[in-house]
């Protein structure tokens, strides 16, 4: 059974983030460029504590931009019904090791439920922009698979704002990516198995073999 809880405040939400979240998932399968699966395991087992990045400028920008990007999406895509609640947390008793907190959730014209995710990124190098060319970067794709797994929704839409600066001018490019659950069922199953194995390693305090992302 899928359950949605709305926690009373951010502190309560943080206290309840005791399982595997969407931003953790890519590290488990070695696709997070910022954290390895071993580093995540050390955090989940209490060996180390997770660094608080909430005051980093890029994180604050993304957090403050989110509500505006959500409203823009509603204007640009009125065929979708947008829903959002602050401090939302989804759980699924099929996957007791995981939870999901969504940027939004959608209902399409056929009544299907969907995930809405937004990303803001500052493009400094051409290689960063290349990762968004006709595809979603691996770590964000894995995050969406995690959300599919927990929510059992039928589709996902990711809105990406790519920001770059040149000669004092700011350039903004917006991209939208849609994924149908039916097209990624095998990947969802693969991730669910990987998360289950990882959580067993956390509970037994068995250090996993190091997985590194491809450069």
Pin down the residues of each PLM region:
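Short glycine-rich, polar/acidic loop-and-turn segments at beta strand-coil junctions
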Residues: 45-47, 67, 71, 86-88, ...
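Non-catalytic C-terminal interaction segments of nucleic acid-processing enzymes
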Residues: 193-215
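Generic detection of long, well-ordered alpha-helical segments
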Residues: 31, 59-67, 137, 185-192
């Amino acid at each position: 059974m899928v359950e949605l809880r709305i926690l009373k405040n951010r502190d309560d939400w943080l206290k309840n983030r005791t399982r595997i979240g969407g931003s953790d998932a890519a590290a488990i399968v070695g696709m997070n460029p910022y954290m390895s699966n071993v580093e995540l395991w050390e955090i989940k087992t209490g060996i180390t504590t997770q660094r608080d990045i909430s005051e980093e400028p890029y994180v604050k920008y993304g957090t403050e931009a989110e509500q505006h990007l959500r409203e823009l999406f509603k204007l640009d895509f009125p065929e979708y019904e947008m829903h959002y609640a602050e401090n939302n947390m989804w759980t699924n008793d099929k996957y007791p090791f995981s939870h999901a907190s969504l940027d939004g959730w959608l209902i399409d014209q056929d009544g299907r439920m969907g995930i809405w995710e937004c990303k803001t990124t500052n493009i400094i190098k051409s290689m960063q922009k290349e990762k968004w060319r006709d595809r979603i970067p691996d770590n964000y794709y894995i995050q969406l698979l995690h959300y599919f797994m927990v929510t059992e929704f039928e589709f996902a839409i990711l809105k990406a704002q790519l920001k770059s600066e040149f000669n004092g001018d700011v350039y903004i490019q917006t991209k939208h990516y849609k994924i149908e659950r039916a097209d990624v069922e095998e990947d969802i199953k693969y991730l669910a198995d990987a998360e289950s194995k990882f959580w067993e390693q956390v509970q037994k305090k068995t250090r996993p073999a190091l997985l590194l992302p491809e450069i």
